[in-house]
UniProtKB/Swiss-Prot annotation:
This is PKHD-type hydroxylase Mnod_1077. InterPro entries: Oxoglu/Fe-dep_dioxygenase_dom, PKHD_C, PKHD_hydroxylase, Pro_4_hyd_alph, Pro_4_hyd_alph_FE2OG_OXY. Binds 1 Fe(2+) ion per subunit. PROSITE patterns: FE2OG_OXY. Residues 78-178 form the Fe2OG dioxygenase domain. 2-oxoglutarate binds at R169.
Length: 227
């Protein structure tokens, strides 16, 4: 399940992120990759323990809290602090699957990466190439979104970033451990959630149909959630 979440950041927040990243220190992105992924990865990253990463990561986590669509799609139990990457001309990240388990910095605990998320910080007309290509059973999906928009997809997905041929592509990325680790079940709950939202727009909240659907949603979540 791929979900496009628009307008996660405001224009002012995007401008702040860009200003901080412009002034930040960029390092070889392979420093944070596993052995296999490091051979496929060619980009730059902001050090995850830097003041810039912490400040902007907290900004993004606050923005996620006000995004019902992200929370409906990911059903997050834990969210890893966001990281920040940059692809300049000639840079890319060949096909790979994200690692299954991630350490949460400073928390002394680990997170199962169920859901991957990329938040775009550069508008599409600022660069050429650089599409995030996600493979699933329906084929390949090339994603290139406006700054401030986000794509949410299963961390089990084979994916890549195409080579940049002009300009520079900046983004934040992070992983979530979901309360519902199975993507098929998450997709069913997401569809049901969106259906309930549509029903509630047309009917009152105390309409029997709205109550019945909401009850089904919560009872399925109760059955499948792992806390």
């Amino acid at each position: 399940m791929l979900v496009h979440v628009p307008n996660v950041l405001t224009p002012a927040e995007i401008a702040l992120c860009r200003a901080r990243l412009e002034a930040g220190e960029w390092i070889d992105g392979r420093a944070t990759a596993g052995q296999q992924a490091a051979r496929a990865k060619h980009n730059l990253q902001i050090p995850e323990d830097s003041d810039t990463a912490r400040e902007l990561g907290e900004l993004i986590l606050r923005a996620l809290g006000r995004s019902p669509l992200f929370n409906a799609a990911a059903l997050p139990l834990r969210v890893l602090p966001p990281l920040f990457n940059r692809y300049d001309v000639g840079m890319s990240f060949r096909n790979h699957v994200d690692g299954a388990v991630r350490a949460i910095p400073g928390a002394g605990m680990r997170l199962r990466a169920d859901v991957s998320t990329t938040l775009f910080l550069t508008d599409p007309d600022a660069y050429e190439g650089g599409e995030l290509v996600i493979e699933d059973t329906f084929g390949s999906h090339a994603v290139k979104l406006p700054a401030g928009d986000m794509i949410v997809y299963p961390a089990t997905s084979l994916h890549r970033v195409e080579p940049i041929t002009r300009g520079s592509r900046w983004s934040a990325f992070f992983w979530s451990q979901s309360m519902v680790k199975d993507d098929g079940r998450r997709a069913l709950l997401f569809d049901l959630d969106q259906g309930i939202t549509g029903v509630r727009r047309k009917l009152s909240d105390d309409d029997p149909a709205a109550i019945a659907l909401t009850s089904c949603y919560h009872n399925l979540l109760r059955r499948w959630a792992e806390m």
